[in-house]
Regions:
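Membrane-interface "helix-start" segments
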Residues: 29-40, 119, 152, 214-258
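Helix-loop junctions and terminal segments of transmembrane helices
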Residues: 74, 78-116, 170-175
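Interhelical loop/hinge segments that connect adjacent transmembrane helices in multipass membrane
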Residues: 7-52, 91, 95-110, 231-246
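Interfacial/gating helices of multi-pass transporter permease domains
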Residues: 30-41, 58-79, 103, 107-111, ...
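Membrane-interface junctions at transmembrane-helix termini in multi-pass inner-membrane proteins
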Residues: 157-189, 231-233
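Hydrophobic alpha-helical transmembrane segments
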Residues: 1-16, 37, 187-192, 206-228, ...
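Interfacial segments at transmembrane-helix termini and the short loops linking adjacent helices
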Residues: 113, 121, 131-161, 233
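Alpha-helical transmembrane segments of polytopic membrane transporters and translocases
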Residues: 4, 39-42, 55-57, 69-89, ...
Length: 258
């Protein structure tokens, strides 16, 4: 199946992009660039895996298996909602990459802002009723559910919404191809969740702080990643706030009222 996918993509690329040519020549600089790109992607994925596994271990060591089960439930709900975001990002990504590759930076910036607000508003529209009725949803799904399952699930959804704002930034960095600084900063910040949560639990705070710490780190990471993106791509912070973040803020404030 993978071979078929590769073949279809190759045929499409050959037809769509006339400048592409098959060649037997090996360019070491190109291979080095591809390996670097892949390596930093793997590095970032490893950091997220470490964060997820480490969080479960820390929770289990302080609060036992019941809270760990509640944490697992919250992760399942968050992953289910996040799948919708992945589908939307998949629809945006080819257009974003194509616009940047062609040097159409005006369209690239518009796609960046559109991806930010569309994915957030769509996810928020799904998340809001779920947050409001989470007890009923868990009761239908599980019957009896562990302590802290409700609060952990709500906080996981909120964390996912904040984290989703960073996904378009990541897609921009991927389109540009300069991943090193982005992945190092993101990975270090994400991994900080584990020791900071451990400190919170050591001083007697409840399990909800695993996600409260995560939300704080996600916000800090968003700011850091915007600074990194600004170094490699020309966009204005004010324009980003006005065209991407403010529509998300309006949707968040007005939706519960409506």
């Amino acid at each position: 199946m993978s071979l078929l996918d590769f073949s279809m993509y190759s045929i499409y690329a050959r037809i769509r992009f006339k400048e592409l040519r098959f060649t037997t020549k090996v360019s070491m600089s190109e291979i080095k660039s591809i390996l670097s790109f892949t390596g930093w992607n793997v590095f970032g994925s490893f950091a997220y895996m470490l964060k997820n596994q480490g969080s479960a271990i820390v929770l289990n060591s302080f609060f036992g298996t019941a809270i760990n089960a509640a944490f697992g439930i919250s992760n399942q709900v968050m992953a289910a909602i996040k799948n919708f975001s992945i589908n939307l990002i998949t629809a945006f990504r080819p257009q974003l990459v194509e616009a940047y590759a062609r040097g159409d930076y005006s369209r690239t910036t518009k796609m960046f802002y559109s991806m930010t607000k569309v994915t957030y508003i769509f996810l928020f529209a799904i998340s809001l009723p779920l947050i409001c009725e989470i007890e009923q949803v868990l009761k239908i799904w599980l019957g009896d559910y562990p302590d802290y399952a409700v609060s952990l699930t709500v906080l996981s959804i909120i964390c996912m919404l904040f984290s989703n704002l960073n996904t378009p930034v990541a897609q921009m960095v991927l389109a540009i191809g300069k991943l090193k600084e982005f992945q190092i900063v993101t990975s270090l910040l994400i991994c900080m969740i584990i020791p900071l949560s451990w400190i919170c639990f050591h001083y007697g705070l409840n399990p909800n702080w695993i996600y409260i710490v995560s939300i704080i780190i996600v916000i800090v990471n968003q700011i850091a990643n915007l600074i990194i993106l600004r170094k490699i791509y020309n966009f204005e912070y004010f324009e980003y706030l006005k065209d991407a973040i403010m529509p998300c803020l309006y949707a968040t404030i007005l939706s519960p009222i409506v």
